Amino acid sequence: MLVWIDCEMTGLDLAHDGLIEVAALVTDGQLNVQGEGVDVIIKPEPQWLDHMNDFVRNMHTTSGLLAELDKGLTMAQAQDQVLDYIRTYVPQAGKAPLAGNTIGTDRSFLAKDMPKLESYVHYRNVDVSSIKELARRWYPRAFGHSPEKQGNHRALADIQESIEELMYWREVLMVPSPGPETTRCDEIAAKYQGFLTGAGRD
């Protein structure tokens, strides 16, 4: 399983900003979405809104998120709702990696504002943006034809687009299942083992 999460924040400063929307979708290993997912809006601390710059304020106004914040949940309520959904499909903590786009930023805010949720997922991340950056350098044609994002800056739509993007990268970049024959895998492993470190080479 993979736990896909996207967050909207009042900004990117961990000391002065915070989460205002969190959405989650769980997929199996083949990227099939489990259930309906969850999307929660959080009523922010007043000082977070005061710190919001014009760019972020305009972005959240255009998306409609800013107008919904007054009716948002508390951070604790929001965390519990997201965890309840995840636990339905991932009943054991520390098993499913966190997935998304540029997920390190989201994870940092989750660790600050929703530590129970952040610690529930595996410490490893599946970051679609890493594959995109490699495609940009190694497969420019595939990069140039990747799915166009709508960029509406709402958490659930952003997750759905991230899953769609990984589906695309899997089909255009990844070796079809079940992959190369065992002997071919061994040949390639021998070719690169110690290529830089010298370890394991005669």
From Swiss-Prot:
Question: Sorted alphabetically, which InterPro entries does this protein's record hold?
Answer: Exonuclease_RNaseT/DNA_pol3 (IPR013520), Oligoribonuclease (IPR022894), RNaseH-like_sf (IPR012337), RNaseH_sf (IPR036397)
The answer to whether keyword Cytoplasm applies is yes
Question: Which keywords annotate this record?
Answer: Cytoplasm, Exonuclease, Hydrolase, Nuclease
Tell me where in or outside the cell this protein is found. Answer: Cytoplasm
Active site: residue positions: Y123
Question: Per the record's keyword annotation, is Plastid included, yes or no?
Answer: no
Annotated Gene Ontology MF terms? 3'-5'-RNA exonuclease activity; nucleic acid binding
Q: What is its EC number?
A: 3.1.15.-
Q: Which GO cellular component terms, listed alphabetically, does the Swiss-Prot or TrEMBL entry include?
A: cytoplasm
The Exonuclease domain is annotated at 2-166
Q: Name the job this protein performs.
A: 3'-to-5' exoribonuclease specific for small oligoribonucleotides.
Protein family? Belongs to the oligoribonuclease family.
- This one is known as Oligoribonuclease
Q: Which organism is it from?
A: Cutibacterium acnes (strain DSM 16379 / KPA171202) (Propionibacterium acnes)
Taxonomy, top ranks, is:
Bacteria, Bacillati, Actinomycetota, Actinomycetes, Propionibacteriales
